[in-house]
Structures are given as C-alpha cells and as structure tokens.
Amino acid sequence: MKRNEAHSPSRRRTRRSLATPALALLASTALPIAALAVDATISITGAWARPTLRGTRTGAAYMTLTNRGQATDRLLSLSTPIADRAELHEETMSGGVMSMKPVTDLMLRPGASVQIDPGHYHVMLIGLRSPLVAGESFSLSLTFEKAGAVVVTVPVTTMPPH
C-alpha cells in the first residue's frame, strides 16, 4: 500500500465506521467492570422480613452481616425503595420494659459476623409504601464506610430461612 492510500478519505471513513461500534462495545462493558472492582468484603446472608398487615406503616427485616475483609468496616446507612426510611435498631430490656433505639455506629471487625435477628438488632422499615406480603421480596441497600453499597434482596416470609 502506498503512503497516500493509507490517508485517503475512504480509508478514514472505514476507520471511523469501525471505531464507533468499538467505542460502543467498550462503553457497554465499563459498568460491569466497575462493579467487579468494588471491594466485596461484606457478605449478607439469611435476609428475610415478616409480612405486615394492611395499613401498617412499619416493618422489620433481618439478616446476618459478615466482614470478610482485612479491615474493620462501619455501617453508614440503609435505604430501600419500599419505605421512606430504613434504620438499624436495637431492642433492649430495662426494668422489665422492652424498648428500641436507633444504632448509629455498627462496626464490623475483620472476620466478625453480626446477627440482625428478632429480639436484638433489626432493620426498621419506616413509612412503608405498601404492606409486606408473604412471597414477595424487596431490595435493601446497606452502605458501608469501606465496602460501599451492598444490595440484598429480602424475601418476605413468615419464618426465617434455614
């Protein structure tokens, strides 16, 4: 090929027409590659929520959080599209009276697991937009200081998974 042929208008059009699909393909893989780069050190297992009655504006979800990383991580926030707010709460017994309070600083040491189960911690779903119905599920996002957002699908069931 002669030097002038390499820079001809038809060659430039061909290179440009091949470049557009190549760039589109590269762009379509950017999100999955970015998702793989996220530090997946927090595992969430055994998620479930109890069904609620019609008209009930609060619900609760349960699960186990495990830090598989090498550094302590901290739960910063929770969110879900099915409620106005999601908060981690702790139930405590004092003087024969059960009460609950928001937990604002849950730390997970390396290798540690935290049970979020009835009678202790629970994810309080405040301002439910519709009842939690057995057999359905919803997404819940837990954002950690180091691991970032971890999304879990929470099935609604009358009994915890085994």
PLM feature segments, named:
Residues 1-13, 21-31:
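N-terminal secretory signal peptides
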Residues 33-37:
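Sec/Tat signal peptide C-region and signal peptidase I cleavage site
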Residues 38-162:
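Compact, glycine-rich, soluble single-domain proteins
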